[in-house]
Amino acid sequence: MINFFLFKGNKIIFVIILLLFSQMIFPITFKYNTGENLVKKKKEEDAREKQIKLLFEAIRKHNNKYVQFYLATEKNIRTRKMLTDKYINRSAGVYGVNLSESSLIEGDGRLVDINSKSQDGYTPIVVAIEAKNHEILKLLIENGANLYERHPIFNRTTVGTAAYYENEEAVEMLLKKDPKLANIGSTVDGWTPLEDATLKTNVKIVKILLQYGANPTITDKHGGTPMDMAVKFGKGEIVKILRDHIKANRSKYH
Protein backbone atom coordinates (compact mmCIF):
# COMPACT_ATOMS: atom_id res chain seq x y z
CA MET A 1 0.00 0.00 0.00
CA ILE A 2 2.83 2.38 0.95
CA ASN A 3 4.60 1.57 -2.31
CA PHE A 4 1.38 2.35 -4.19
CA PHE A 5 1.10 5.82 -2.60
CA LEU A 6 4.79 6.48 -3.22
CA PHE A 7 4.32 5.52 -6.87
CA LYS A 8 1.20 7.67 -7.16
CA GLY A 9 2.93 10.58 -5.41
CA ASN A 10 5.94 10.34 -7.70
CA LYS A 11 3.63 10.26 -10.70
CA ILE A 12 1.90 13.46 -9.57
CA ILE A 13 5.26 15.17 -8.97
CA PHE A 14 6.43 14.06 -12.43
CA VAL A 15 3.28 15.50 -14.05
CA ILE A 16 3.73 18.82 -12.20
CA ILE A 17 7.40 19.04 -13.27
CA LEU A 18 6.40 18.21 -16.86
CA LEU A 19 3.75 20.95 -16.86
CA LEU A 20 6.20 23.51 -15.44
CA PHE A 21 8.82 22.54 -18.01
CA SER A 22 6.37 22.75 -20.92
CA GLN A 23 5.17 26.15 -19.64
CA MET A 24 8.77 27.41 -19.79
CA ILE A 25 9.30 26.10 -23.33
CA PHE A 26 5.77 26.78 -24.68
CA PRO A 27 4.11 29.47 -22.55
CA ILE A 28 0.41 28.83 -22.11
CA THR A 29 -1.02 31.93 -23.70
CA PHE A 30 -3.52 30.36 -26.09
CA LYS A 31 -6.43 30.89 -23.75
CA TYR A 32 -5.83 34.65 -23.83
CA ASN A 33 -4.56 35.03 -27.40
CA THR A 34 -7.84 34.35 -29.18
CA GLY A 35 -9.67 37.34 -27.71
CA GLU A 36 -6.75 39.72 -27.33
CA ASN A 37 -5.30 39.03 -30.78
CA LEU A 38 -8.68 39.48 -32.46
CA VAL A 39 -9.17 42.86 -30.78
CA LYS A 40 -5.66 43.96 -31.71
CA LYS A 41 -6.10 42.73 -35.29
CA LYS A 42 -9.45 44.55 -35.59
CA LYS A 43 -7.91 47.80 -34.34
CA GLU A 44 -5.06 47.49 -36.84
CA GLU A 45 -7.50 46.76 -39.69
CA ASP A 46 -9.68 49.75 -38.72
CA ALA A 47 -6.64 52.04 -38.56
CA ARG A 48 -5.45 50.82 -41.95
CA GLU A 49 -8.91 51.25 -43.49
CA LYS A 50 -9.10 54.79 -42.12
CA GLN A 51 -5.71 55.60 -43.63
CA ILE A 52 -6.72 54.18 -47.03
CA LYS A 53 -10.00 56.12 -46.99
CA LEU A 54 -8.16 59.36 -46.14
CA LEU A 55 -5.86 58.75 -49.11
CA PHE A 56 -8.85 58.13 -51.41
CA GLU A 57 -10.52 61.31 -50.17
CA ALA A 58 -7.34 63.25 -50.94
CA ILE A 59 -7.20 61.75 -54.46
CA ARG A 60 -10.83 62.73 -55.09
CA LYS A 61 -10.23 66.28 -53.84
CA HIS A 62 -6.97 66.55 -55.83
CA ASN A 63 -5.05 67.14 -52.59
CA ASN A 64 -2.02 65.72 -54.34
CA LYS A 65 0.64 66.82 -51.85
CA TYR A 66 -1.03 64.66 -49.21
CA VAL A 67 -1.26 61.73 -51.64
CA GLN A 68 2.36 62.11 -52.74
CA PHE A 69 3.49 62.14 -49.10
CA TYR A 70 1.62 59.03 -47.95
CA LEU A 71 1.68 56.84 -51.06
CA ALA A 72 4.27 54.05 -51.02
CA THR A 73 6.15 55.22 -54.08
CA GLU A 74 9.73 54.08 -54.68
CA LYS A 75 10.94 57.56 -53.73
CA ASN A 76 8.97 57.61 -50.46
CA ILE A 77 10.14 54.13 -49.50
CA ARG A 78 13.78 55.16 -50.00
CA THR A 79 13.28 58.42 -48.09
CA ARG A 80 11.58 56.73 -45.13
CA LYS A 81 14.34 54.11 -44.99
CA MET A 82 16.99 56.82 -44.98
CA LEU A 83 15.25 58.71 -42.16
CA THR A 84 14.71 55.53 -40.17
CA ASP A 85 18.34 54.47 -40.51
CA LYS A 86 19.65 57.95 -39.72
CA TYR A 87 17.46 58.99 -36.79
CA ILE A 88 15.64 55.93 -35.42
CA ASN A 89 17.77 52.83 -35.94
CA ARG A 90 21.18 54.34 -35.32
CA SER A 91 24.14 51.99 -35.36
CA ALA A 92 25.79 51.32 -32.01
CA GLY A 93 28.26 54.04 -31.11
CA VAL A 94 26.78 56.67 -33.43
CA TYR A 95 26.42 59.98 -31.60
CA GLY A 96 22.96 61.42 -31.19
CA VAL A 97 19.60 60.72 -29.61
CA ASN A 98 17.41 58.08 -31.24
CA LEU A 99 14.07 59.54 -32.27
CA SER A 100 10.72 57.84 -32.65
CA GLU A 101 8.89 57.73 -35.98
CA SER A 102 6.05 59.84 -34.56
CA SER A 103 8.50 62.64 -33.76
CA LEU A 104 9.73 62.68 -37.36
CA ILE A 105 6.40 62.29 -39.16
CA GLU A 106 3.18 63.90 -37.98
CA GLY A 107 0.20 61.59 -37.48
CA ASP A 108 0.21 58.02 -38.79
CA GLY A 109 3.42 57.98 -40.78
CA ARG A 110 2.86 54.61 -42.42
CA LEU A 111 2.86 54.59 -46.21
CA VAL A 112 -0.16 53.32 -48.13
CA ASP A 113 0.62 50.59 -50.65
CA ILE A 114 0.20 51.48 -54.33
CA ASN A 115 -2.27 48.60 -54.78
CA SER A 116 -3.97 48.80 -51.37
CA LYS A 117 -7.65 47.91 -51.42
CA SER A 118 -10.37 49.31 -49.16
CA GLN A 119 -12.95 47.04 -47.60
CA ASP A 120 -15.44 48.06 -50.30
CA GLY A 121 -13.01 47.04 -53.05
CA TYR A 122 -11.64 50.37 -54.27
CA THR A 123 -7.96 50.85 -55.14
CA PRO A 124 -5.95 54.07 -55.64
CA ILE A 125 -5.83 53.67 -59.44
CA VAL A 126 -9.60 53.23 -59.78
CA VAL A 127 -10.24 56.25 -57.54
CA ALA A 128 -7.75 58.36 -59.53
CA ILE A 129 -9.49 57.44 -62.80
CA GLU A 130 -12.94 58.26 -61.40
CA ALA A 131 -11.70 61.58 -60.00
CA LYS A 132 -9.83 62.44 -63.23
CA ASN A 133 -6.76 63.04 -61.11
CA HIS A 134 -4.22 62.61 -63.88
CA GLU A 135 -1.20 63.68 -61.83
CA ILE A 136 -1.79 60.88 -59.32
CA LEU A 137 -2.74 58.40 -62.05
CA LYS A 138 0.62 59.08 -63.73
CA LEU A 139 2.39 58.60 -60.38
CA LEU A 140 0.59 55.29 -59.81
CA ILE A 141 1.41 53.98 -63.28
CA GLU A 142 5.08 54.95 -62.90
CA ASN A 143 5.25 53.14 -59.56
CA GLY A 144 3.85 49.83 -60.75
CA ALA A 145 0.14 50.07 -59.93
CA ASN A 146 -1.86 47.08 -61.15
CA LEU A 147 -3.47 48.20 -64.42
CA TYR A 148 -5.74 45.16 -64.37
CA GLU A 149 -7.60 46.20 -61.24
CA ARG A 150 -11.37 46.19 -61.72
CA HIS A 151 -14.00 48.64 -60.61
CA PRO A 152 -15.72 47.10 -57.56
CA ILE A 153 -19.21 47.99 -58.81
CA PHE A 154 -19.03 47.95 -62.63
CA ASN A 155 -16.40 45.19 -62.86
CA ARG A 156 -14.59 47.06 -65.63
CA THR A 157 -10.82 47.18 -66.03
CA THR A 158 -8.97 50.46 -65.60
CA VAL A 159 -9.43 51.33 -69.29
CA GLY A 160 -13.08 50.27 -69.17
CA THR A 161 -13.57 52.47 -66.10
CA ALA A 162 -11.85 55.38 -67.86
CA ALA A 163 -14.11 54.93 -70.91
CA TYR A 164 -17.21 54.73 -68.70
CA TYR A 165 -16.29 57.99 -66.95
CA GLU A 166 -15.23 59.55 -70.29
CA ASN A 167 -11.75 60.16 -68.97
CA GLU A 168 -9.97 60.56 -72.30
CA GLU A 169 -6.54 61.34 -70.86
CA ALA A 170 -6.66 58.31 -68.57
CA VAL A 171 -7.61 56.02 -71.49
CA GLU A 172 -4.53 57.12 -73.44
CA MET A 173 -2.18 57.02 -70.43
CA LEU A 174 -3.22 53.46 -69.61
CA LEU A 175 -3.09 52.19 -73.20
CA LYS A 176 0.36 53.68 -73.72
CA LYS A 177 1.52 51.54 -70.81
CA ASP A 178 -0.38 48.40 -71.85
CA PRO A 179 -2.29 48.34 -75.20
CA LYS A 180 -3.72 44.88 -74.43
CA LEU A 181 -6.18 46.56 -72.07
CA ALA A 182 -8.08 47.86 -75.11
CA ASN A 183 -9.85 44.53 -75.64
CA ILE A 184 -10.42 43.29 -72.10
CA GLY A 185 -14.08 43.43 -71.16
CA SER A 186 -16.14 43.04 -68.02
CA THR A 187 -16.28 39.53 -66.58
CA VAL A 188 -19.98 40.13 -65.87
CA ASP A 189 -21.42 41.16 -69.25
CA GLY A 190 -18.34 41.08 -71.47
CA TRP A 191 -18.66 44.76 -72.38
CA THR A 192 -15.44 46.13 -73.82
CA PRO A 193 -14.12 49.69 -73.37
CA LEU A 194 -15.14 50.32 -77.00
CA GLU A 195 -18.76 49.52 -76.17
CA ASP A 196 -18.70 51.96 -73.24
CA ALA A 197 -17.19 54.68 -75.43
CA THR A 198 -19.78 53.98 -78.14
CA LEU A 199 -22.70 54.15 -75.72
CA LYS A 200 -21.37 57.46 -74.35
CA THR A 201 -20.94 58.75 -77.94
CA ASN A 202 -17.39 59.70 -77.08
CA VAL A 203 -15.80 59.87 -80.51
CA LYS A 204 -12.37 60.81 -79.16
CA ILE A 205 -12.16 57.75 -76.90
CA VAL A 206 -13.42 55.51 -79.72
CA LYS A 207 -10.58 56.77 -81.93
CA ILE A 208 -7.99 56.35 -79.15
CA LEU A 209 -9.12 52.78 -78.51
CA LEU A 210 -8.97 51.89 -82.22
CA GLN A 211 -5.53 53.49 -82.46
CA TYR A 212 -4.27 51.18 -79.69
CA GLY A 213 -5.75 48.03 -81.19
CA ALA A 214 -9.34 47.79 -79.95
CA ASN A 215 -11.24 45.17 -81.97
CA PRO A 216 -14.73 46.42 -82.99
CA THR A 217 -15.85 42.90 -83.91
CA ILE A 218 -15.46 41.37 -80.43
CA THR A 219 -18.80 40.16 -79.07
CA ASP A 220 -19.91 40.59 -75.49
CA LYS A 221 -21.71 37.92 -73.46
CA HIS A 222 -25.01 38.90 -75.09
CA GLY A 223 -23.59 38.44 -78.58
CA GLY A 224 -23.42 42.16 -79.36
CA THR A 225 -20.55 44.21 -80.80
CA PRO A 226 -19.68 47.92 -80.64
CA MET A 227 -21.01 48.24 -84.20
CA ASP A 228 -24.33 46.66 -83.18
CA MET A 229 -24.58 49.15 -80.32
CA ALA A 230 -23.72 52.11 -82.53
CA VAL A 231 -26.40 51.12 -85.06
CA LYS A 232 -29.03 50.31 -82.41
CA PHE A 233 -28.65 53.62 -80.58
CA GLY A 234 -28.23 55.79 -83.66
CA LYS A 235 -24.60 56.76 -83.12
CA GLY A 236 -24.13 57.78 -86.77
CA GLU A 237 -20.62 59.23 -86.54
CA ILE A 238 -19.34 56.23 -84.62
CA VAL A 239 -21.01 53.82 -87.07
CA LYS A 240 -18.99 55.45 -89.86
CA ILE A 241 -15.74 55.38 -87.85
CA LEU A 242 -16.17 51.69 -86.99
CA ARG A 243 -17.26 50.73 -90.50
CA ASP A 244 -14.29 52.51 -92.08
CA HIS A 245 -11.92 50.93 -89.56
CA ILE A 246 -13.24 47.41 -90.20
CA LYS A 247 -13.05 47.97 -93.97
CA ALA A 248 -9.44 49.22 -93.72
CA ASN A 249 -8.49 46.22 -91.58
CA ARG A 250 -10.59 43.59 -93.35
CA SER A 251 -7.82 40.98 -93.41
CA LYS A 252 -7.29 41.47 -89.68
CA TYR A 253 -10.91 40.88 -88.66
CA HIS A 254 -11.99 38.22 -91.18
What are these regions (language model features)?
Residues 32-118:
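N-terminal segments that cap or nucleate solenoid repeat domains
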Residues 79, 114-117, 147-151, 181-186, ...:
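Ankyrin repeat boundary signal
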Residues 53-56, 89, 123-127, 157-161, ...:
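Ankyrin repeat (ANK) core detector
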Residues 57-62, 127-133, 161-167, 196-202, ...:
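Ankyrin repeat A-helix N-terminal signature
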Residues 71-76, 105-112, 138-146, 172-181, ...:
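Ankyrin repeat domain, specifically the short helix-to-loop turn at the C-terminus of the second helix
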Residues 51, 121, 154-155, 189-190, ...:
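Start-of-repeat signature of ankyrin repeats
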Residues 28-54, 212, 231-254:
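Ankyrin-repeat-protein effector appendages
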Residues 66, 135-136, 169-170, 204-205, ...:
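Conserved ankyrin/ankyrin-like repeat signature
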